[in-house]
């Protein structure tokens, strides 16, 4: 996927989906994302599914890789 395609895909994401994607980049799973964002696990999983559809990704890892590789989101936080 090209930089422009990823950029366009990220523009389709809602603010909340971008938050969820950033948490995926930081290594959180949907259960942890739910706790972090004060939402239900079901809602977190729904956001992840929506992100995958909009980014045409087959997994969370692929979505994270596309976003980070193309410089669309900051790299994961390191300790």
Role assignments for model-derived ranges:
Residues 21-25, 52, 64:
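Hydrophobic residues on short alpha-helical segments
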Residues 8, 25, 36:
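Conserved short-loop catalytic and cofactor-binding motifs
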Residues 53-79:
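Basic, Lys/Arg-enriched C-terminal extension of HTH/homeodomain DNA-binding domains
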Residues 1-22, 74-76:
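Regulatory hinge/linker segments at domain boundaries
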Residues 23-25, 42, 68:
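Short amphipathic helical patch at the helix-1/turn junction of helix-turn-helix
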Residues 17-18, 46-50, 70:
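Hydrophobic alpha-helical segments, especially transmembrane helices
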Residues 29-62:
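Recognition helix of helix-turn-helix DNA-binding domains
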């Amino acid at each position: 996927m090209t930089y422009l395609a990823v950029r366009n895909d990220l523009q389709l994401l809602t603010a909340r989906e971008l938050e969820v994607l950033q948490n995926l980049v930081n290594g959180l799973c949907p259960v942890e994302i739910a706790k972090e964002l004060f939402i239900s696990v079901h809602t977190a999983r729904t956001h992840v599914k929506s992100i995958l559809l909009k980014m045409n990704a087959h997994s969370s890892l692929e979505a994270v890789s596309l976003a980070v590789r193309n410089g669309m989101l900051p790299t994961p936080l390191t300790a």
